[in-house]
Amino acid sequence: MVALKKVAEILKNQLKCEETNLRFWTILTFAAGILACFFTGQTARMIVATSTCIVLLLAVIFHILNRNTKILIVFLVAFLCGFLSAAWKIYTTPDEPTKYGAREAIFDAKVRDIRLTSGDTILTLSAINPPILSLKNGLLKLKYSGNPMEFSVGSTVKIKTSIRTVSYGVFLGDKSYENYARFFGIIARGNIKELEVVDSTSQSFTDNFRKHLQSRIYEATNRSRGAGVIIAILTGNNSFIPQEQLDNIRHSGCAHILAISGLHMSVIVSFVFMIFIHIFSLFPSIALRYNTKKFAAIPAIAVCLIYLQIANVPISAFRSFIMVTLGFLALFLNRARTTMNVLFFTFLSMLVLSPERILSPSFQMSFMAVFGFISAYNSRLVNNVNWHPIKSRTVRYVGGILASSIIATLSTVFFEIYHFKQYAWIGLISNIPVIPLTEFVVLPISFVGMLCNGTALGDLLYCVADFFACIICQITDYTANLHNAYLLAPQMQTWQLGIIIAGLVAVFLARSWVIKIGGMIIAVCGLISYINSPKPVLVYNQNLKNVVFLEGGKYYSVEPIKSDYLHKIWAQNLGVREILPMSDSKVLSCQRARDRIIGCEYKIADNVYSIKYSNKKKPVAVYFNGGRFVERKD
């Protein structure tokens, strides 16, 4: 009994350490409520909402009876608020449209968004009087291979397209894209075959400047491959980077340099902030009477806002802009600036405005990376390290970059595996030269060139930046082509990701070593569950058009997967580089009727796996073992 009392006392003291983090845990509980609503069915939502309300009512009653349940009430209210905000988003989102195959259609549409890539242009459109009535209930995301410069956001276009509704994943059990697409209003995808501009609205000054900037950089550098990197860093448009080069940048673990995120924004803001501080210091009448930092913050925020508009307001840059603004606001008000407070307030404000953003990979990875950096910086492990004995600046620099890469990798690797089914470990090495070249050479020089855009000095600065950008391309080309530079990972289940991230959040945020150890155990359990997940033996889509089976550690396709995109997605989800065509020697046999697969049978050891149609013409997986059939519907 004495030992138990001591343990209870230790736990009580440890939990008291979390009182200073109560606001952070409350915000995370709000986010948990959003996720609980998005990833449960209609019946489960009613059960969760009712149970939460009952527990909240009981907690209030106990609190009235002088029982200390204040913290429990706060958490329940936060969870319920997050749950209800997500429920409202679901309620106001159109229901899933009727499923149909690819259809040819001609109709007018209004351009809502344009995203340029190294291949096709991705257009987000809203249909105007379409022949398929359900298309009026949401947005269309279509690929266009023509010239995107002839129209802009707000233009009305007439398109001829092959279109299909967004389906529940192109891979068995993978519903992540449809969950993301539905709450962002995307109900159909397809390809534009013909496009005619009906009404071209006048482009804004920002759009015109962005297009002129891109063409000027491209021509000033003689269309060098480094020009694409410069354009991506300044405008967020990676369409000027060749596809092979873009793949190498991703496989080398350096794709983050192309995303306008907090690192880019902080370099630009710090650059402008320091310049204006030195300018104001030249005037003693100002420097001696006023706080020049407050004056310098005004142009820094203005430049940050301009950079955000030129970059077309990506999520990661928007998050960084809010954090920068809040930091300078604290400077104006003479308040202490705590980075964790700023991060969580930004996190909460973005979720309150758009709870569906929590489903965005960019949102998840951006916040988790910054969260990891701040937590590591605030930890005793970092603060207690004595760096002074290390006299070599090179060693300290390499160690700092390597430590930053490890922290960023640990924070985001599981999101990378979940969304992209791969992990570029080589990034731990390639980032050592790439990050300083990008942030302290290419970005500042390019930014000054942008300020002098249209002049000979601007063109000269673009050429200088292009020289170093080409060095970055050479580094990424070399590291990406090393043996096993990036590793493919099989599909991770949503619940496995949730367990791992919950454990990491506890490790990063908690002050109590008890909660830290508990979070570490939870994260390890989730990781072990993922590693030990059995490989699927038989995989198929809803109409049995594509059937893939496992034999000898390799996957074989019954019929060739005609779509390169579909082949890539299936291979990624299965964690392999390719799916091989089935040869005549394989043991999988398929029954056919009028050249259509109606069932397949695969023998492995004493078991027989088979796929066939049910009475309702829907595919059913049947597993046979010891003479007993067990149906498992897809």
Can you annotate each of these PLM segments?
Residues 33, 109, 161, 233, ...:
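Divalent metal-coordination and catalytic microenvironments
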